[in-house]
């Protein structure tokens, strides 16, 4: 009985996840689908042909989005590891304040944050640049990385590194050979979360990038706002495909890194 309930819940969750994806695929080739009709009244290849007909622009948007999100994910992982080790293993003045600052971006609405940081970035010359967008995304994504890596760092502790030091390892060797392989699943999960947060940012990218830095979100959202569901669906499917591909790459890296042939780093 318990197994049947679990299977029913899993089936329901799969339906909730897959049904919107199926509707996106249908809307890619739909020109008119008015309520209350159950099926589209008119099919068309207009949206798909228009998007894929601009391959040059599409590739630029693709590389820009992946570059920004990958940079944010990598920086979030590196800074997250260093921050968590400092907060967990060391005592210093202002430790509690630093811990509070790591979650502060959670408390500030994105609109308020974007408006405030835009003025600062204009003075620093970082507006309308990819580096400025990466830095802004990093501030929003870093708390996710810190929170995820913090739990893993606390659970692991420093005892194994201390034993490696006793056996003659340097501080870097003790971390790289002992702690890092164990923390790899947590670090990659944090990087994945940071990637998703960055990849889906619209308002912050618009404010800091000033329309000069184009990502999938910047291109897709105007079609959603204008009601052109066919065009929005094409970009949404591409958005989903790119994200799943990157997550597949992270899964492969996780398997290689941890040398675990039985499961990936999400398990």
Regions found by a protein language model. Give the residues of each.
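C-terminal transmembrane helix and the adjacent membrane-cytosol boundary/short C-terminal tail
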Residues: 1-8, 13, 19, 30, ...
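Faces of alpha-helical transmembrane segments in polytopic inner-membrane proteins
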Residues: 16-17, 72, 76-79, 101-112, ...
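Transmembrane-helix boundary motif in ABC transporter permease subunits
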Residues: 1-4, 68-102, 115, 119, ...
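Loop-to-helix entry region at the N-terminal start of transmembrane alpha-helices
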Residues: 57-64, 119-142, 184-191, 235
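Periplasmic/extracellular loop-to-transmembrane helix junction in inner-membrane transport proteins
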Residues: 33-72, 225-227
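Membrane-interfacial helix termini and adjacent extracytoplasmic/periplasmic loops
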Residues: 36-39, 95-96, 111-141, 172, ...
